[in-house]
Amino acid sequence: MSDIPNDSIMRWDEETRRFSVFRRPSNKSNGLTRDRQGRLIVCEHGARRLTRTEYDGSITVLMDRFESKQLNSPNDVVVKSDDSIWFTDPALGRQNNYTGYVDAPELPDHVYRLDRSGRAIVVAADINRPNGLAFSPDENKLYIVEYGVLPRSLRVYDVVDDGQR
């Protein structure tokens, strides 16, 4: 679980039924998930990047730029069964002091797909402040929360064979 104000990722221990710190600092982590190999995938608002925590605890930067421009504030993330990583990148984490970092975005709000080779593509560019995202159980639909306009909405996209939406 991410604890953005305390710059921490927390770990739940089922045996003791308590949380403990897994990583601090976490670069103001937000969205977390596991890849198909069980490694932790982290959206880091503060460092403006998507990372993977390896089994030995080291951190691999998966993506911090798109077309030579720095990401905004990766927000939420899901991994598809083909090992591609899909994540939202709204500017929202850079536009207020909640994360402690305020600056102008270099990119518009996007949803990205990062394939196993490390190639990234924009899969949604028409969403104002994309936030949470999830696949349908058969992975044929991608659901994305649009956070930036009222009323907030849930967008649904078809996912096509090449992994795009």
What are these regions (language model features)?
Residues M1-R165:
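Sequence-structural signature of mature extracellular/luminal beta-sheet repeat domains
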